[in-house]
Amino acid sequence: YNKQILDEAGLEDPNALYERGEWTWDKWREYMVALTRDSDGDGVIDMYGYDSRWDFLVYNLTMSNGTVIAGSDKENLSSPEVTECLDFIYNMYNVDHVAKPWNSDDFDSNQNAYLDGNIAFWIDAAWISSANNDAGLDFDVVWCPWPIGPSGNEATNKFKNVSSGNAWMIPAGVDNPELVYNVFYDWQNWYHGDTDLRDGDLTWWEDCAITEENYAVMEYMGQRGAFDLWNALGLEWDWSALLNGEMTAAQ
């Protein structure tokens, strides 16, 4: 989040609230409502409580609500817990209007809007911080855990989708699966077994945290993963309709 925006509004650090078990969806909504405003009096909202990518928002809200969409052989999209997540997103964009209107013409602009200094909360990561040079911004970037949803709790609050990344599979019935495996292994073994070479540049993300406090938050969140394949199923999810109010969670 943008520390200066919260400080100017007299709002407490969400990390302190999280430590006390008070950083919840309701509290986050309260913050976003307070921080969405017309700052120059021209009648146009120019400060928003939130903006980021919708897929990151879906992932993190479901995990913080103690649930997933596609984490087993049973469909969970229609569950009460996921519905709570979709309702929260719908309300952010169409009821409270605390989220900057979704820009369907420029996907990356939704992730990077915070760079202008008028977004209170956004979804950050080491690679985003590195690409956008967060350390060089004229405001302080503070990382905090996700607020806990109404169906979640501290124990079930997850922050990392462990199914992200590339996975290679060998279908059942393939001739000589061991040969196929060895080909893939050699293809990926660009470091020729030298793990120091493979892992030598993995400290770059420590610098992306900017502060020791942010690094501690990142380390904590990185240890709490959930498994959800919903965004890798090749299905056509009409999320824009939810964001622009054409469709409700129930629909």
Q: Where are these predicted regions, by residue range?
A:
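C-terminal capping/gating helix-and-loop segments adjacent to ligand/active sites or protein-protein/ligand interfaces
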Residues: L197, E206, E212-Q251
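Periplasmic solute-binding protein
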Residues: Y1-A16, D51-S72, V162-M169, G234, ...
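Alpha-to-beta junction loops
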Residues: L115-D124, F139
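Short, solvent-exposed loop/beta-turn-alpha elements that line the ligand-binding surface or hinge
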Residues: Y18-R20, G66-C85, I148-F159
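Glycine-centered hinge/linker elements that transmit conformational signals in sensory
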Residues: R29-A34, A70-S104
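Short helix-initiation/N-cap motifs at beta->coil->alpha
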Residues: G21-K27, P101-L115
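Acidic, glycine-anchored loop motifs typical of Ca2+
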Residues: D38-D46, E154
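Extracytoplasmic/periplasmic substrate-recognition and gating elements
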Residues: D134-E206
